Swiss-Prot record:
Keyword RNA-binding belongs to the record: no
Main enzyme class: isomerase
Keywords (A to Z) from UniProt: Gluconeogenesis, Glycolysis, Isomerase
Upper classification of the organism: Bacteria, Pseudomonadati, Spirochaetota, Spirochaetia, Spirochaetales
Listed name of the protein: 2,3-bisphosphoglycerate-dependent phosphoglycerate mutase
Xref: HAMAP family: PGAM_GpmA
Organism: Treponema denticola (strain ATCC 35405 / DSM 14222 / CIP 103919 / JCM 8153 / KCTC 15104)
UniProt similarity note: Belongs to the phosphoglycerate mutase family. BPG-dependent PGAM subfamily.
The protein's Enzyme Commission number: 5.4.2.11
Amino acid sequence: MRLVLVRHGESEWNKLNLFTGWTDVDLSEKGVEEAKEGGTYLKKEGFDFDICYTSYLKRAIHTLNYILSQMDREWLPVIKTWKLNERHYGGLQGLNKAETAEKYGEDQVKIWRRSFDIAPPVLEEGDKRCPYLQEQYRGIEKSELPLTESLKDTIARAVPFFEKTIKPQMLEGKRILITAHGNSLRALVKYFENLSDEEIISVNIPTGVPLVYEFDKNFKVLSKRYLGDQEKINAKINAVANQGKKK
């Protein structure tokens, strides 16, 4: 069985080094090109899909659209779910990562960004950034929607969705593409590879690069690989790792 994961292309706030979370910002020009390049590599290597999954956030949705356009597969069914949204960064959303590191220290920012079970400061009730005040979540119970999340919290929504919805389809032979976010994809990577809480801290996923997993019938990982220029991919991974450091 094969599964392809793609983190959305660079967003406008990635470019500005801001904590984004559930803020619904679009792709930058570079992000559009990354998404198209990802689609080109998938087509070049002969990939095809039956069902696609993405989040409620336009940077992931648009990345998927560009990928499918490059593959001439815009007619494929697409299922959107908030369960694949980025981790909610609470009160950090909209703040510059480097400036936050200057204020609180790199160690604290790394804990907020990369720790397993420590969430950033919670949003106050009524803050305009609260998901329950936003249109795309109007059909979801307020109690289900986070005001901040740790990676552990993100796993608690993303992995059960995968197990209940996507995994059975894969076992039926469906070819699946998931276009989502750094932390919702890290949640799945931790689950697939049975990584420890400490090991996942150092995992960084580059923007716009297809990550291909091969599984056996028992869902054990047989192989994983990124599609594309490996030197460029490594540079992207290092750039993600350095986002929370002082200027």
